[in-house]
Regions:
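Hydrophobic, aromatic-rich transmembrane alpha-helices
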Residues: 1-19, 32
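C-terminal, well-structured subdomains that either form a transmembrane helix-short loop-helix hairpin
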Residues: 3, 30-56, 99, 181-189
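Hydrophobic alpha-helical cores of multi-pass transmembrane domains in eukaryotic membrane proteins
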Residues: 4, 24-33, 49-61, 68-79
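Short amphipathic alpha-helical interaction elements and helix-loop-helix interfaces
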Residues: 10, 16, 39-42, 54, ...
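Membrane-interfacial loop-to-transmembrane alpha-helix junctions, especially the N-terminal start
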Residues: 15-25, 66-67
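Membrane-interface catalytic loops of GT-C/OST-like multi-pass glycosylation enzymes that act
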Residues: 22, 26, 35-50, 63, ...
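Catalytic lumenal/periplasmic loop and adjoining terminal transmembrane helix
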Residues: 63-250
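C-terminal helix/juxtamembrane-tail motif
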Residues: 249-260
Length: 260
């Protein structure tokens, strides 16, 4: 849009009439305006407007401006290609492929494991291979993408009470009714709010039940979570420092801190 406005400078009535008599430009501008008025729309919904807008762009006529145009075009596409093609949600597939080995290395005797995928897209489950129902190691992917942090921790705490090793050595649920499970969290490093300087190796949280300890197993560094940016609350600098500075997708095993 900025490029189109620049090409229309100076904004005379004749130029504006000529621009908006273009049906492709009018369709793209109208669609962008309508979608922009509706809250919680994602940028990808505007993708159909891009081909329409590109057909309305006239390349600069002078050699210098034409050179600037192509330089900026190459830089823009290289930067967006790196961001969206490598880093945007880029740790999901490597993490999903590595999970069976991570779980078996951490707890070789476990037969059931639930992995909570939090603040990230749910991964393709077929990448787990033969770890579905009935396998020696059954891995279930739990979609927790939109959960608040407190709700996620409470949910896992309840699940640990039901399926984890009891703190007291005894449980209200008879052993023959208990399915022993391990619980894991796969989440962007930037998603955690811990109230102290962030260290993926030292994460613990207090819930209404015994405190939770998170044992860090792995980090997949080529991952940026663009869906957890809050410029209104944190400001531009703090948001970018958190999302870009703490880039990466981590995997943690969740356990309880039982009182002595």
């Amino acid at each position: 849009m900025v490029l189109l406005l620049t090409l229309g400078y100076p904004m005379t009535t004749a130029k504006l009439k000529a621009m908006f008599s273009n049906s492709r430009l009018t369709a793209a501008a109208t669609g962008t305006l309508i979608l922009s008025l509706i809250p919680h729309q994602e940028p990808r919904f505007l993708l159909p407007c891009i081909p329409l807008l590109l057909t309305c762009v006239r390349l600069p006529s002078t050699a210098d401006w034409r050179r600037y145009f192509w330089i900026s075009w190459i830089i823009f596409n290289a930067a967006l290609g790196l961001l969206m093609g490598v880093y945007h949600q880029g740790g999901i597939i490597p993490a999903q492929l590595a999970l069976p080995a991570l779980i078996q290395h951490t707890h070789p005797s476990v037969s059931h494991a639930d992995v909570f995928w939090w603040k990230t897209y749910p991964p393709p489950t077929y990448l787990l291979g033969d770890h579905g129902p009935g396998a020696d190691l059954e891995i279930a992917s739990v979609n927790s993408m939109g959960m608040p942090q407190s709700e996620l921790l409470q949910t896992i705490s309840l699940a640990l009470e039901k399926h984890g090793a009891p703190c007291s050595g005894a449980s209200l649920i008879p052993s023959f009714l208990r399915t022993q499970k391990d619980f894991y969290i796969a989440a962007p490093l930037s998603a955690w709010r811990s109230g102290k300087p962030f260290d993926p190796q030292d994460l613990s949280f207090v819930t209404d039940r015994p405190a939770l300890n998170l044992t860090h197993l792995a980090t997949f560094p080529k991952h940026i979570n663009l869906d957890d940016m809050d410029f209104g609350e944190e400001g531009v600098y703090n948001t970018l420092a958190r999302v870009v500075g703490r880039r990466g997708l981590g995997v943690w095993r969740v356990g309880r801190s039982c009182p002595p």
